[in-house]
Amino acid sequence: QAKKFEKIKAKLNSKMSSKQFNMILKQVEEISHKMSKIGGYASLSYSSDTQSDEATSLMTQMSKLGSEISNKILFFDLWWKTQVDEKNANRLMKDTGELKEYLAYKRLFAKYALSESEEKIINTLDVTGISALVKLYDKITNVYEYKMKVGNKTKVMTREELTNYVRSTNPKIRETAYK
């Protein structure tokens, strides 16, 4: 679907009809929705067992796929932010319903937009850079066991279990969890 979407690039024109624009937005939504579903599954699978090589592999594959798809549809985002004048942007946004605020928000970042090739590099580095480090950190720290006194008993728990106490509304419990 993302490959098919790439063909729209040649048809982008700030003077297009609202109907055409909404059809393009619908395609972007469909692609994003599908990626969210499969990415969500991979993320939940990984979150349920960060030590699982299978879940880690699936998560890595989905991150890579997400980056590839983002790179394929990136041109639309950049076109919207940098190549559509204010008058046409307002005209096109008028009939977008609940997406109007989102589209207006996107345009606020126009001055920070990089070239398409630079944005693609950033998308790719997100998968191999910080995301990879976070996964490695999770894999290492999720095998640690922590001892915490809860009531009259000392409990042994994982980092994830301890995090529940760190976020407690009770300040004394939070303090104990941090120690």
Regions flagged by a language model, labelled:
Residues 1-179:
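A well-structured
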